[in-house]
Amino acid sequence: AVGNVFARLVGTDESLPVVMSGSHIDSVKNGGRFDGLVGSIGALEAVRVMVEEGYQPKNSIDIVFFAEEEGSNFQVPVMGSKLLTGKLTVDDIKEIKNEAGITAYDMIKNAGYDPDNMPNDVIAPGTVKNMIELHIEQSVRRDKEGHTIGIISGIAGLNWITITLEGVQNHAGATPMFLRQDPMVAASKIIAEIDGIAKAINDTIVATVGYIEVTPNIPNAIPNGVKFVVDVRDIQQETIQQCVDEIKAVTEKYAKENDVKFTVEKTASSEAIKIQDYIKEVMVEQAEKLDLDYVLMPSGAVHDSNYMAEVTDVAMIFVPSVDGRSHVNEEYTDWDDIKAGVDLLLNTLVAISQ
């Protein structure tokens, strides 16, 4: 109904919950060609090998390609998995708009899908046994430390908070500094504080401002509005909230100092996820059988698995990103590392589906 793509290797007992694997097929603007696609094509390749070898699982295996994981169109990430797990409704997507003012509902419909059928696509409890996602690491640790495989012990939660500042537009040359109500000044001070707020909390939390919108965005006028999005992530839910609260406090402080109005709105969130011990043990066992150099590690990025964890036990496999680069054209993962990741995915899928 919304652009998620599925394929199934039918098992010998179709009454059993399915085992699912896959990732997303979209990217960010000016992004790379490995993020998401390694896990999507990796799942397809793992199932292709099963078919080639004549293996039929007991549990059916579903390959899934999730739509709109990055949030590039609507600044709402992981839409495909949110819709699959009932976290977004038809009414919600009628309200979500992109920069051109097109709603998610209309874009889905114009692409030939039926968004009104979304409720029928929501995964029913007990119908998915596990979701296993292969992904590039998107960080420098595996590449620098030399491990081929990361077996994920937990997935970071995320909050996106949208901060809007409203001032008074006026002439850049004729308006004295002491008479200005400049939202850009307030925004710059808030953004400068965010780095220190995150660093003071712990070593795992991260906070990023990667999107900013200024109106009217011309060089010879004081802006009347600034909107920016703060991306806060950590493997502990309570520290995410602490960071958000402190950002709200400095927003209020600098808005008042610069005599501008402000709003702070949470526009996206996902809970931190703990990977269940039994599935980690299966993956460790299979990694050792394959003689892979692996390490247990947390994931700092949010993935579709965060939302799939609402309906099933999830697990993730990471392969190294060269120089830690991701969401850039230079994004690259060595093909031998991808093969190792797909081998572990294949063995894990076989182990939990028989």
Task: Tell where the protein language model's regions lie, with residue ranges.
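Acidic/His- and Gly-rich active-site-bordering loop/insert found
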Residues: A1-G32, M50
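Acidic, glycine-rich active-site loops and adjacent beta-strand->loop/helix elements
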Residues: V5, I25-S27, I61-S72, Q138, ...
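Alpha-helical metal-binding/catalytic segments enriched in His/Glu/Asp
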Residues: S21-H24, N30-E70, N159-L165, H171-I197, ...
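Zn-dependent metallopeptidase/amidohydrolase metal-coordination segment
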Residues: G22-S23, D293-L344
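Flexible, glycine/charged-enriched surface loops at secondary-structure junctions
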Residues: Q56-P57, M118-V122, A174, G196-V209, ...
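Midchain, well-structured core segments that form catalytic/ion-binding scaffolds
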Residues: E68-E69, Q75-Q237
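Short beta-alpha connecting loops at secondary-structure transitions
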Residues: D91, R233-Q236, T267-S269, G324-W335
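A short beta-alpha structural unit
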Residues: T208-N217, V229-I235, K261-K280, N306
